[in-house]
């Protein structure tokens, strides 16, 4: 597993292919927007009379018409024309004017260079692409006249960002490229911040599931593909249409004879991978980041979940788009950013390979059995830096001193963790242990080289520690000695000129100056060697020939020290890059170790268990719980009610009835989430669990309309149901809620019945089918694998108590009027509803057997869906057990306490259920 990521390969620059015209996709972009958007000046010629700087702007804007141009001018990035108007509106900053263009003032806005990342973050999140234009020479040191040379140094797009402040520490930042070859799609996704690079071949029908699993920041794909809710993330179309050329260029990029050394790639996958690399290279102005080789992952080996299932289960995103009250938030005990990302990846792509699942379980299980070691390991991992992303920035030439420090600190943490894991280990931990060992000279060199603490920016100086480089120390000594001379001169000048308050200060534009108060100005004007340079409201500034010479010496020494420090820093970066593969593998090992300790921490409470994983179709859970709801209830007065689930071979379809608010939806979701956790290799919230590997998971719980696509709630429900019936198989798990609602009662009942039959008899999937159509419980005789269950309810003196407990048996009421009362429906309306319900129930007396419902001409299990049902199955007249008749005759209702009455009712129910199972009577659940 780790071997796939260990061998990070240095990419070689490849011939630059012709770059097609790009079309940026800011929010709400359209053809109309394009003519008035970021690129509206693309065809504008350089106007006569333009200043040299503005002439540069026009040239660069014509090269990057669809990006906002961050044009460096001194300490600001300036934006002009439509760029300025778009940026000012997005950033809520002031729009000003500068100069004229064709007789009109030029719109302008700007952001400070030191705060640019904050503004970039807001623009990128709104979907803009930004071209960064830097000054390519120092204004102070350049020779000759004319404008400062400027050029675009990079394009910042949602899928190609690397800055720590722009990235979400807990989520990958993926660029996804999709191409088409014949009837197959090829997808390639990469994260330049960590080096991840993977591909997959899929049908177009699997596209939304892929998008839901990856949640990419930016998508490159043909305009003919419909991305639905991800369309706002669509990047410029940049097609690659020659698979042979794509394979050859990929092989050249990785310096191999053929890309098949990395695995088997379809033509579409190869073209998608090359498209992604081209886009990244263009965004980095020809440079390529350190990327692992492309890994074809394929669809096999992962639990398949479509987009609606992911949304329904709120795995890592809640319905409101946030991350709270999700499965990830409920189980996360990771201590590092990389560990958080890996845990999210495990939950987003659970496995179907029992061997790999078991290896993960063995890893956290071993840590669980070593509590003292685990505690020390957590202390070691706490505060571990994000080595992978630091390495990515260093490889791109944008590494900061703190990125070098992150590699240093991460290496020390890895060494300490490796020391803790010495000895006999399970295979999962043994593999990690091997990857934690970096070449010892690397952390030693970084420890000796870097100052502590390191500054945030290289420009601030002081990155390299004293004593590491003799030449740098010498230049710093000259600079610092000259500064000591300045301090001595201040004392000498104050005494010589009789001005006790005289100060020598450095100014960015003037250099070192003598500053005196106003009362001393006239006296110093008469001193021949002093030259007045600047008057001030409260004094004046003078210079002196000796001071000017010292200023020159200090400036030159400081510049030599700066240049030498840059040489040393560059050497450190190169040393880090030389070990990039080992560092990347170490970073992944630390992340995996963090996930395993998180799982062990979760299991420490004793209320989470290690599920038994098998390749059969069993799915049994003892005292299972919904992890998110349980976490929300923690500390409150009401504990979560655990429930069992038994979908073993002889009872693999569970028909669940019961009232609203009784917990049906929670129960459905909790079983799906337990399967996800189990197949991610993690503990599950249950006393015990036996999970036969699920290949596809479908959750249709809680539907809503899709106004953007013009679909009603019922249409959305039917579309999702159709997907289940087409894609589910014998190894699938299907949890569905209220199939058939949103239409007439008979239509809904007919649809629910037909779907239930298909899942039971044709597909054979493990199924939990929640419904308010209580009549479906009568299908138990027709569908041998079906078992009815209901949510238990207690009623006393007109009040209903929902017990949130699943019990075997069929429910007879939905308690909708009681729920309406609890919801605050006016009392008069509730009373009227109760009267109408009573009347309707009385009218329906005698119409409750199958013979009186034409709909219940049940098809037999061996009939196909297209065959009409034949025959009406008569229900046998109900006969009460003699024991029950005798007990009723002896009962004295007026002498019973409420508790005795309730116990007696449950006893009667048990007697009825016992006879119902023998086929003599149908029992109604109380």
UniProtKB/Swiss-Prot annotation:
Segments forming a coiled coil: none
The keyword DNA damage appears for this protein: yes
InterPro entries reported in the protein's UniProt record: DNA_mismatch_repair_MutS (IPR005748), DNA_mismatch_repair_MutS-lik_N (IPR007695), DNA_mismatch_repair_MutS/MSH (IPR017261), DNA_mismatch_repair_MutS_C (IPR000432), DNA_mismatch_repair_MutS_clamp (IPR007861), DNA_mismatch_repair_MutS_core (IPR007696), DNA_mismatch_repair_MutS_N (IPR016151), DNA_mismatch_repair_MutS_sf (IPR036187)
An example Gene Ontology CC term for this record: cytosol
Gene Ontology terms for molecular function: ATP binding; ATP-dependent DNA damage sensor activity; damaged DNA binding; mismatched DNA binding
Region (Disordered): 16-40
Composition bias, Low complexity: 26-40
Keywords annotated in UniProt: ATP-binding, DNA damage, DNA repair, DNA-binding, Nucleotide-binding
CDD domains attached to this UniProt entry: ABC_MutS1 (cd03284)
GO biological process: one example: mismatch repair
Residues given in the record as ATP binding sites: 658-665
One family name in Pfam for this protein: MutS_II
Family the UniProt entry places it in: Belongs to the DNA mismatch repair MutS family.
Function: This protein is involved in the repair of mismatches in DNA. It is possible that it carries out the mismatch recognition step. This protein has a weak ATPase activity.
Name of this chain's protein: DNA mismatch repair protein MutS
Organism, scientific name: Granulibacter bethesdensis (strain ATCC BAA-1260 / CGDNIH1)
Gene name in the database record: mutS
């Amino acid at each position: 597993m780790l071997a796939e990521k260990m061998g990070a390969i240095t990419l070689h620059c490849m011939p630059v292919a012709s770059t097609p015209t790009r079309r940026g996709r800011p929010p709400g972009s359209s053809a109309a927007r394009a003519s008035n958007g970021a690129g509206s000046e693309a065809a504008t010629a350089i106007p006569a009379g333009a200043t040299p700087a503005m002439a540069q702007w026009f040239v660069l804007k014509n090269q990057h018409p669809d990006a906002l141009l961050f044009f460096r001018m001194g300490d600001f990035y300036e934006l002009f024309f439509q760029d300025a108007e778009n940026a000012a509106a997005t950033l809520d900053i002031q729009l000003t004017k500068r100069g004229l263009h064709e007789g009109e003032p030029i719109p302008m806005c700007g952001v400070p260079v030191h705060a640019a990342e904050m503004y970039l973050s807001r623009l990128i999140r709104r979907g803009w692409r930004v071209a960064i234009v830097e000054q390519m020479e120092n204004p102070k040191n350049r020779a000759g006249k004319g404008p400062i040379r400027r050029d675009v140094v990079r394009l910042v797009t949602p899928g190609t960002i690397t800055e720590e402040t722009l990235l979400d520490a807990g989520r990958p930042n993926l660029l996804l490229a999709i191409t088409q070859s014949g009837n197959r799609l090829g997808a390639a996704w990469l994260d330049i911040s960590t080096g991840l690079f993977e591909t997959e071949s899929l049908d177009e029908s699997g596209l939304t599931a892929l998008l839901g699993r990856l949640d990419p920041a930016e998508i490159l794909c043909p305009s003919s593909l419909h991305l639905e809710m991800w369309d706002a993330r669509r990047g410029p179309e940049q097609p690659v249409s020659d698979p042979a050329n794509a394979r050859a260029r990929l092989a050249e990029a990785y310096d191999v004879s053929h890309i098949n050394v990395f695995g088997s790639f379809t033509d579409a996958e190869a073209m998608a991978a090359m498209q992604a690399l081209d886009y990244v290279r263009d965004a980095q102005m020809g440079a390529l980041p350190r990327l692992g080789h492309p890994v074809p992952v394929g669809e096999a080996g992962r639990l398949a979940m479509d987009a609606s299932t992911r949304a329904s289960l709120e795995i890592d995103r809640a319905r409101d788009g946030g991350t709270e009250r999700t499965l990830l938030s409920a189980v996360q005990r990771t201590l590092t950013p990389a560990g958080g990302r890996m845990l999210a990846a495990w939950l987003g792509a659970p496995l179907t390979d029992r061997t790999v699942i078991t290896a993960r379980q063995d890893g956290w299980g071993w840590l669980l059995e070593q509590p003292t070691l685990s505690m020390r390991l957590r202390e070691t991992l706490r505060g571990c830096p994000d080595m992978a992303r630091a390495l990515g920035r260093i490889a791109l030439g944008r590494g900061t001193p703190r990125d070098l420090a992150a590699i240093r600190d991460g290496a020390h943490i890895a060494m300490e963790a490796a020391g803790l894991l010495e000895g006999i280990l399970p295979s999962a931990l043994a593999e990690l242990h091997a990857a934690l060992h970096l070449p010892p000279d690397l952390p030693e060199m970084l420890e000796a080289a870097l100052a502590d603490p390191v500054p945030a920016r290289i420009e601030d100086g002081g990155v390299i520690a004293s004593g590491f480089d003799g030449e740098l120390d010498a230049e710093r000594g000259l600079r610092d000695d000259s500064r000591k001379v300045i301090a001595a001169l201040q004392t000498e000048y104050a005494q010589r000129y009789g001005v006790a308050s005289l100060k020598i200060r450095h100014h960015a534009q003037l250099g070192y100056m003598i500053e005196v108060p106003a009362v001393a100005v006239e006296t110093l004007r008469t001193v021949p060697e002093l030259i007045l340079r600047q008057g001030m409201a409260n004094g004046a500034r003078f210079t002196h020939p000796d001071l000017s010479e010292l200023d020159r010496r200090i400036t030159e020494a400081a510049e030599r020290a700066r240049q030498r420090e840059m040489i040393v820093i560059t050497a450190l970066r190169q040393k880090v890059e030389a070990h990039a593969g080992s560092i990347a593998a170490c970073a992944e090992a630390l992340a995996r170790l963090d996930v395993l300790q998180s799982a062990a921490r979760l299991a420490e409470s004793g209320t989470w268990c290690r599920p038994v994983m098998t390749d059969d179709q069993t799915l049994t859970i003892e005292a299972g719980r919904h992890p998110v709801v349980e976490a929300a209830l923690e500390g409150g007065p009401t504990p979560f009610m655990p429930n069992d689930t038994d979908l073993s071979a002889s009872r693999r379809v569970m028909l669940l009835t019961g009232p609203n608010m009784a917990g049906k939806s929670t129960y459905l979701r909790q079983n799906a989430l337990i399967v996800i956790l189990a197949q991610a290799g993690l503990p599950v919230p249950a006393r015990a669990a036996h999970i036969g590997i699920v290949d596809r998971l479908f959750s249709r719980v809680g539907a809503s309309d899709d106004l953007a696509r013009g679909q009603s709630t019922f249409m959305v429900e039917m579309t999702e149901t159709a997907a289940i019936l087409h894609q589910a198989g014998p190894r699938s798990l299907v949890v569905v809620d209220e199939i058939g609602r949103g239409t007439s009662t008979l239509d809904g009942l007919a649809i629910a019945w037909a779907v239930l039959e298909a899942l039971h008899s044709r597909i054979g999937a493990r199924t939990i089918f929640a419904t308010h159509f209580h009549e479906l419980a009568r299908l138990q005789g027709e569908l041998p694998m079906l078992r009815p269950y209901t949510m238990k309810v207690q009623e006393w003196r007109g009040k209903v108590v929902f017990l949130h407990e699943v019990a075997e048996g069929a429910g007879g009421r939905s308690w909708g009027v009681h729920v309406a009362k609890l919801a605050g429906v006016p009392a008069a309306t509730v009373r009227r509803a109760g009267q109408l319900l009573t009347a309707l129930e009385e009218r329906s007396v005698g119409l409750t057997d199958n013979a009186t419902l034409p709909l219940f001409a049940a098809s037999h299990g061996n009939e196909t869906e297209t065959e009409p049902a034949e025959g009406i199955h008569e229900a046998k007249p109900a006969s009460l057990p003699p024991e029950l008749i005798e007990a009723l005759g002896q009962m004295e209702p007026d002498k019973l306490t409420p508790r005795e009455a309730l116990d007696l009712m449950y006893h009667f129910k048990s007697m009825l259920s016992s006879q119902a199972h023998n086929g003599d009577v149908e029992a109604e659940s109380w």
